[in-house]
């Protein structure tokens, strides 16, 4: 039963209908009383006016209830959640920009058969509890689907609660394998931690590295997850992992861990952390005299483009990381996206902007697929399932590569190995989808 808080009290539609009948009965009784008693016409008019005012108020409240419980017939509401304040806000804001750009273009080109896609955007501050609160808020607002969350830990929290509601969910960037494990409703536009760990271990083998060390944030699902898979894959490939060094979230001095790794003389060091930590680690390693190779994962995105407070282009020279998108990629679709993004925001997009763009592309394609069939009504359980089925079956040609699904919410897609050459990023190798 639909309920809404009105003037500080929860009033149900059933209660509104009952109250309306009471007022109508009251007015009819007044008419009878006027005929059977000495009630004057002036008194009757006054009491009738009061009853009419009450009836009008109930009508307004009922109208508010109806408006709040349904979507406009010419729009489709989609939630967008992420960290727009806090320590990881740069990722959330980048994805939000990409989502908004694609939806703007999509609506300008006719939307979903004339219907616009409207976005409900909410900040979860990078916190799992807040992310679940935002999810409940979106549920109350009757969104049809959600693009989110962004980082792995809040994304897992949302995926857990959304599975019971069968809410269609697309994360642009959550890489933790568990994100898609709770139900068939959750999908991602990016690669998994497992995929990245294996890709970089195989890359190390192809580069001829016989020994590697690792340094990672033990408090992060993303960092520790990729490190674990990388180490396991290296062992399978015959690469000796000489030292694994963990650090705590928030640490800024990595000299002890780096010194321990360098004492084992590895051919390369794997550093699967977000770019703030990774940049500091590379910088401190160079200060310690290490001139060797660092390997990274997609959290390295944003390391360059003038962000020299973490690592300089000179310090990053000859390092490698995997990532599905860089602006330097000489691809026509990428070039068009970079131009459109720069025109909209006055700066170049990052990997996370591109993933947000592709996540919105996936969602809008599914919305149109369902609308084209026209056999289910938005807001129903049947509509949610139809949307989930459409996401699973549609294939989109995104700016981070083609995205398709084969039985799970994890995409089959290509990625890039990126290197740093004379202060600039460039594509070193394309890893094709299997």
Provide a role label for each language-model segment:
Residues 23, 30, 36-48, 64-434:
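Extracytosolic ligand-binding ectodomains
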Residues 1-64:
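N-terminal secretory signal peptides
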């Amino acid at each position: 039963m639909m309920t809404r808080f009105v003037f500080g009290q929860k009033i149900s539609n059933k209660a509104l209908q009952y109250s309306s009948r009471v007022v109508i009965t009251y007015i009819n009784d007044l008419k009878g009383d006027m005929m059977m008693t000495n009630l004057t016409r002036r008194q009757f008019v006054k009491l009738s006016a009061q009853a009419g005012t009450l009836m009008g108020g109930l009508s307004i409240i009922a109208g508010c209830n109806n408006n709040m419980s349904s979507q406009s017939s010419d729009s489709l509401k989609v939630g967008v959640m992420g960290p727009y304040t806090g320590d990881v806000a740069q990722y959330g804001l980048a994805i939000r920009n990409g989502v908004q750009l694609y939806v703007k273009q999509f609506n300008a080109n006719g939307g979903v058969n004339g219907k616009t896609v409207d976005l409900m955007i909410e900040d979860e501050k990078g916190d799992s509890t807040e992310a679940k609160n935002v999810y409940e808020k979106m549920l109350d607002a009757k969104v049809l689907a959600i693009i989110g969350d962004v980082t792995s830990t809040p994304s897992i929290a949302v995926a857990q609660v959304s599975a019971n509601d069968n809410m269609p969910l697309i994360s642009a960037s959550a890489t933790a394998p568990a994100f898609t494990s709770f139900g068939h409703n959750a999908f991602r536009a990016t690669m998994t931690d497992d995929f990245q760990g294996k890709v970089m271990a195989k890359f190390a083998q192809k580069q001829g590295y016989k020994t590697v060390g690792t340094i990672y944030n033990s408090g992060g699902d993303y960092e520790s997850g990729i490190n674990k898979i990388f180490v396991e894959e290296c062992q399978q490939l015959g690469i000796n992992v000489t030292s694994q060094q963990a650090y705590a979230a928030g640490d800024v001095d990595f000299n002890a861990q780096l010194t321990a790794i360098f004492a084992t003389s590895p051919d390369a060091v794997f550093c699967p952390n977000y770019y703030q930590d990774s940049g500091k680690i590379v910088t401190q390693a160079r200060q310690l005299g290490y001139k060797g190779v660092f390997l990274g994962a997609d959290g390295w995105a944003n390391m360059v483009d003038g962000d020299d407070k973490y690592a300089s282009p000179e310090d990053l020279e000859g390092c490698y990381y995997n990532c599905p998108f860089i602006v330097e990629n000489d691809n026509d679709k990428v070039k068009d996206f970079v131009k459109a993004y720069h025109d909209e925001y006055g700066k170049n997009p990052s990997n996370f902007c591109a993933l947000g763009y592709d996540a919105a592309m996936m969602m809008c394609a599914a919305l149109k697929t369902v609308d084209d069939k026209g056999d289910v009504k938005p807001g129903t359980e049947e509509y949610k399932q139809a949307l989930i089925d459409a996401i699973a079956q549609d294939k989109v040609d995104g700016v981070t590569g083609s995205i398709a699904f084969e039985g799970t919410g994890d995409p089959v897609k290509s990625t890039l190995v990126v290197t740093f050459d004379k202060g600039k990023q460039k594509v070193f190798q394309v890893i094709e989808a299997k």
